Amino acid sequence: MQPKFNNQAKQDKLVLTGKILEIIHGDKFRVLLENNVEVDAHLAGKMRMRRLRILPGDLVEVEFSPYDLKLGRIIGRK
């Protein structure tokens, strides 16, 4: 029997809204989430390919893995 891949990894992602506080280096940012927690986040690949500019004060969507809630990926701008 072949194993079934139901893309469980994508379903386990947590997405929160946050505000960019500062640019740390290149594509790394410090983000203040809606629940007043500061985390570090980096640009997702599609955001990097589109060369979207993220500035301090922008509202963004941050995706987290359930294994590491201190590091996120910026997947979109609001």
UniProtKB/Swiss-Prot annotation:
Domain S1-like: start-end pairs: 4-78
Q: Which SUPFAM superfamilies match?
A: Nucleic acid-binding proteins
Q: Does the keyword Cytoplasm apply?
A: yes
Pfam families reported in the protein's UniProt record: eIF-1a
Q: Which UniProt keywords apply?
A: Cytoplasm, Initiation factor, Protein biosynthesis, RNA-binding, rRNA-binding
Q: Which residues form a coiled coil?
A: none
First-listed, main subcellular location of the protein, grouped into a coarse class: cytoplasm
* GO CC annotation: cytosol
Q: Which locations, inside or outside the cell, does it occupy?
A: Cytoplasm
Recorded GO terms, molecular function?
Answer: ribosome binding; rRNA binding; translation initiation factor activity
- The reply on keyword Transferase is no
- InterPro entries linked: NA-bd_OB-fold, RNA-binding_domain_S1_IF1, TIF_IF1
Quote the function comment for this protein: One of the essential components for the initiation of protein synthesis. Stabilizes the binding of IF-2 and IF-3 on the 30S subunit to which N-formylmethionyl-tRNA(fMet) subsequently binds. Helps modulate mRNA selection, yielding the 30S pre-initiation complex (PIC). Upon addition of the 50S ribosomal subunit IF-1, IF-2 and IF-3 are released leaving the mature 70S translation initiation complex.
Assembly and partners are described as:
Component of the 30S ribosomal translation pre-initiation complex which assembles on the 30S ribosome in the order IF-2 and IF-3, IF-1 and N-formylmethionyl-tRNA(fMet); mRNA recruitment can occur at any time during PIC assembly.
Q: Into which family does the record put it?
A: Belongs to the IF-1 family.
Give the matching HAMAP family.
IF_1 (MF_00075)
Q: How is this protein named in the record?
A: Translation initiation factor IF-1
The record lists the organism as Mycoplasma pneumoniae (strain ATCC 29342 / M129 / Subtype 1)
